[in-house]
């Protein structure tokens, strides 16, 4: 799997809203920061955060666009992206967008997400 293939697989896994599909793509030491500023350190905390979002946002669609590869080497890769999501929260339509930065680490021949920072888009 290349870093580009990882991004496609990660986007598809997120779209299923199932941790069991996302989990193989997450590094044990992952650190994820959501656009609301919450930080989740370690795979177990990332799992809790993702599962909370999956249960809160019904019928979610999530997409990434405008990928920019900052660097891609044999063991690490870094990319920037725009993200958009929409779904239903408490029976009401909801949506959001922002910018993200992700760091991938190759471990045991497989790319895994080790860091992701999601933020709001500047006006």
Predicted features along the sequence, with ranges:
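Short beta-strand segments enriched in hydrophobic/aromatic residues
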Residues: 26, 83-85, 117-120
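C-terminal and inter-domain tail/linker signature
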Residues: 29-30, 43-44, 90, 110-115
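A short, structured loop/turn motif at beta-sheet edges
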Residues: 69-76, 92, 104-112
């Amino acid at each position: 799997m290349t870093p580009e293939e990882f991004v496609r697989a990660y986007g598809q896994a997120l779209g299923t809203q199932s941790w069991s599909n996302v989990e193989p793509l997450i590094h044990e030491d992952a650190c994820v920061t959501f656009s609301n500023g919450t930080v989740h350190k370690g795979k177990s905390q990332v799992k809790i955060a993702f599962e909370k979002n999956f249960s809160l946002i019904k019928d979610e669609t999530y997409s990434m666009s405008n990928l920019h590869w900052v660097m891609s080497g044999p063991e690490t890769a870094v990319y920037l992206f725009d993200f958009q999501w929409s779904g239903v929260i408490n029976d009401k339509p909801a949506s959001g967008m922002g910018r993200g930065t992700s760091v991938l680490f190759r471990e045991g021949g497989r790319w895994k997400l080790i860091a992701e920072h999601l933020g709001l888009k500047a006006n």
